[in-house]
């Protein structure tokens, strides 16, 4: 594997004209123009969606030396470079806007932004809020990332969720540090370095295994420190200035060294400078040791080890002269000098890609060697040219990559709710009624209870316990995502949306309880099924009560037809379920058309219900036909579930190996195989006759050998391939429907496309 495919070295004479002191070679991605285009696109998109003026004054990745993305991702091909640079700048913009708010406003915006990515969060998610606009913007770029590399894109989001502690833009108190190591432990999370490397992996299309990470761990330790502390070093003057002028927090390794070693600012900066040089030398020594100990080290690991060093050097070089870190000097109006009492550096080498300024340039006295070197942009006019004519504005106290990852972590941590394992809201206790009943019960003597003729409600603890349990289970949140995505077109007010979510969740969770009982299923989403904890009778009673609650919610809608809509779709749901149970009990395999009709009523009924309720509650007058889309999505969702149950390791973990076979379920792959292979009918009949059908007898799993044989038959007969091709046809039809509706409404819907892409069975 060639190490340097997408980058070129920076000339020594260019490096010497900057205050950069990195000892490592500096390279830049050959496609700096792609990175610049991505930055400008991020600015345009931000301005289009948010209209807050931030894009006009922001200083982000563009500089005369090159784009931050081109230095941070030197070995990333153009298509992926555009994605990661865009995300980096999007994060910087979000962080700037967030930091500019007062604390109360910032916290409100942060909560609402988080609510938009959590399908079961009950905070309002109004379309007009800043968070809602950001959600749509982020959904689009995440969709593009998944389309480029679905597996790596999803891995990146998963790692964000598992390895990143989101920074809430200044919320919380920064601890006092007793050592730089203690500070580093804090900053690894605050900075986002754990999430940055998955971003690099996505960019380089290089998935590191656990064994790979263990092998390169000695190298990554100094690299992590160098990236974080390099940013701290070059941003310290600006952050110090802002802490003096507006009281912003100062979280910086220079400040930590100054405090714990009782040094002056100049002494602390000199100490950090030496620490950075030492870290780079430590990286080189450990790199040589790894190569010596592993002469046959895989080529992809050798490339990774080389690239991370270049990333340190490149971001160091960029930060040494970037307008983001240095332009504040010329925008200051209070006369404060930089913390090191040195004038802003100026770079006199004209850029090949941007117009150079003929304005005045300042000279910098280098504190280390006494030489005078012209370095970085010195006046507002130059900065305007170097940043695509962006005017100066307030900057945050963080790092460009920390800022990028702050947004991405908040997005991916909550976007994961699109995909794997976010938990349902717990059903809310009706505390006032329950407390009243308890006090009423306890306040009576035994004799007065026997003589009392007044009626009162007992406590709801027993009734609610199974409900709380099923609602606590993790969920993919597909239906909640669809409600939010449909609302881009239907524009239902938040009050009605909250009721619709509540009603749909009640029905869905009630159906899960009953399905598990009817299917004799011992597990649900990797946990014991509700009836195995609370018993069949109590579980059924609570599920029935959830239907009562759903009717109560339906009566609260403005549209008087809501209850009728609910009852009609409940009838369809029960009709569909009746045939699913009938086929199983009588061991009669349906035809493919019969099966699809069952799906349209059972699975599609819930999708159709949420759509009809939204249409009934919408305020707009423009008619939007979404009926066909819900039918297609219901079929796609159910058939995909059938397919994955027999093919996916995740389903094995959560439900057991091929649990549909244990249940005796005539799922879509079984139905198709029976329709096309007569001999399979006898085989599957014989298999299913081995399982009990009486609800009291419980389910006895089929022998693993039998299930493996059935799966192998489905595979060799081409049934799985047929199912996958049918799912891809459904995907294409859904995409065509989305295209049609987007044209009719003139409203793009990246959230719905992102949801479909996540569920896709297409190969990457």
Swiss-Prot record:
- Motif extent (DDXXD 1): 95-99
**Annotated Mg(2+) 4 binding sites:** 515, 519
This protein's domain notes = The conserved DDXXD motifs as well as the NSE/DTE motif are important for the catalytic activity, presumably through binding to Mg(2+).
Prenyltransferase: annotated segments: 332-759
Native source species: Neosartorya fischeri (strain ATCC 1020 / DSM 3700 / CBS 544.65 / FGSC A1164 / JCM 1740 / NRRL 181 / WB 181)
Please give the name of this protein.
Answer: Sesterfisherol synthase
Single GO molecular function: prenyltransferase activity
Q: In which pathway does it act?
A: Secondary metabolite biosynthesis; terpenoid biosynthesis
- Motif NSE/DTE positions after renumbering to this chain: 231-239
Reaction catalysis annotation: isopentenyl diphosphate + (2E,6E)-farnesyl diphosphate = (2E,6E,10E)-geranylgeranyl diphosphate + diphosphate; isopentenyl diphosphate + (2E,6E,10E)-geranylgeranyl diphosphate = (2E,6E,10E,14E)-geranylfarnesyl diphosphate + diphosphate; (2E,6E,10E,14E)-geranylfarnesyl diphosphate + H2O = sesterfisherol + diphosphate
């Amino acid at each position: 594997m060639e190490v340097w495919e997408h980058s070129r070295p920076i000339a020594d004479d260019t490096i010497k004209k900057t205050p950069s002191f990195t000892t490592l070679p500096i390279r830049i991605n050959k496609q700096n123009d792609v990175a610049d285009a991505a930055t400008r696109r991020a600015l345009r998109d931000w301005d289009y969606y948010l209209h807050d003026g931030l894009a006009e004054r922001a200083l982000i990745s563009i500089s005369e030396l090159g784009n931050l993305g081109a230095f941070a991702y030197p070995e990333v091909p153009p298509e992926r470079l555009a994605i990661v640079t865009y995300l980096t700048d999007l994060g910087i913009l979000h962080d700037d806007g967030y930091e500019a708010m007062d604390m109360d406003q910032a916290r409100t915006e942060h909560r609402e932004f988080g609510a938009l990515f959590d399908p079961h969060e009950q905070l309002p998610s109004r379309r007009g809020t800043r968070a809602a606009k950001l959600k749509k913007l982020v959904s689009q770029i995440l969709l593009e990332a998944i389309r480029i590399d679905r597996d790596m894109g999803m891995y990146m989001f998963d790692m964000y969720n598992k390895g990143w502690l989101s920074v809430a833009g200044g919320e919380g108190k920064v601890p006092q540090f007793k050592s730089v190591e203690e500070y580093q432990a804090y900053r690894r999370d605050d900075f986002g370095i754990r999430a940055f490397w998955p971003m690099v992996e996505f960019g380089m299309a290089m998935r590191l295994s656990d064994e790979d990470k263990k092998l390169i761990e000695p190298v990554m330790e100094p690299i992590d420190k160098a990236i974080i502390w390099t940013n701290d070093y070059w941003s310290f003057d600006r952050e110090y200035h802002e802490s003096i002028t507006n009281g912003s927090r100062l979280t910086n390794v220079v400040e930590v060294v100054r405090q714990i070693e009782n040094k002056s600012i100049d002494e602390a900066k000199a100490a950090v400078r030496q620490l950075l040089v030492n870290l780079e030398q430590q990286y080189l020594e450990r790199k040589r040791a790894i190569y010596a100990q592993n002469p046959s080290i895989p080529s992809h690991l050798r490339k990774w080890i080389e690239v991370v060093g270049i990333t340190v050097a490149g971001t160091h070089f960029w930060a040494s002269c970037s307008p983001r870190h240095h332009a504040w000097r010329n925008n200051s109006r209070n006369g404060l000098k930089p913390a090191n009492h040195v004038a802003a550096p100026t770079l006199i080498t004209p850029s090949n890609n941007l117009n150079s300024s003929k304005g005045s340039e300042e000279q910098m006295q280098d504190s280390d060697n006494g030489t005078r070197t012209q370095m970085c942009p010195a006046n507002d006019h130059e900065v305007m040219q170097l940043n695509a004519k962006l005017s100066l504005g307030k900057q945050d106290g963080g790092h460009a990559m920390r800022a990028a990852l702050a947004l991405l972590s908040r997005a991916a941590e909550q976007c994961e709710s699109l995909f794997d394992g976010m938990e349902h809201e717990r059903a809310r206790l009706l505390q006032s009624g329950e407390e009243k009943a308890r006090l009423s019960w306890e306040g009576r003597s035994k004799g007065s209870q026997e003589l009392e003729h007044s009626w009162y409600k007992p406590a709801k603890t027993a009734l609610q316990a199974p409900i709380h349990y099923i609602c606590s289970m993790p969920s993919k949140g597909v239906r909640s995502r669809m409600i939010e995505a449909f609302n881009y077109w239907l524009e239902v007010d938040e009050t009605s949306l909250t009721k619709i979510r509540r009603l749909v969740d009640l029905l869905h969770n009630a159906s899960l309880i009953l399905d598990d009982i009817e299917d004799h299923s011992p597990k649900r989403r990797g946990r014991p099924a509700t009836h195995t904890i609370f018993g069949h009778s109590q579980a059924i009673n609570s599920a029935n009560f959830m239907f009562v609650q759903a009717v109560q919610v339906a009566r609260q809608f403005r549209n008087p037809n809501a209850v009728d809509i609910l009852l009609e779709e409940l009838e369809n749901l029960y009709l569909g379920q009746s045939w699913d149970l009938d086929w199983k009990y009588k061991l009669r395999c349906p035809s493919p058309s019969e099966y699809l009709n069952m799906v349209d009523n059972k699975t599609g009924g819930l999708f159709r219900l949420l759509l009809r309720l939204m249409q009934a509650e919408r305020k707009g007058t423009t008619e939007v036909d979404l009926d066909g889309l819900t039918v297609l999505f219901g079929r796609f969702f159910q058939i995909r579930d059938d397919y994955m149950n027999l093919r996916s390791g995740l389903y094995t973990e959560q439900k057991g190996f091929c649990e549909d076979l244990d249940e005796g379920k005539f799922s879509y792959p079984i139905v198709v195989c029976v329709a096309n292979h007569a001999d399979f009918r006898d085989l599957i009949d014989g298999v299913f006759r081995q399982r009990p059908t009486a609800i009291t007898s419980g389910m006895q799993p089929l022998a693993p050998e039998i299930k493996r044989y059935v799966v192998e038959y489905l595979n060799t007969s081409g049934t799985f391939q047929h199912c996958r091709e049918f799912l891809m046809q459904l995907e294409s039809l859904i995409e065509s429907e989305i295209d049609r509706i987007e044209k009719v409404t003139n409203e793009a819907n990246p959230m719905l496309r992102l949801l479909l892409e996540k569920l896709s069975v297409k190969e990457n």
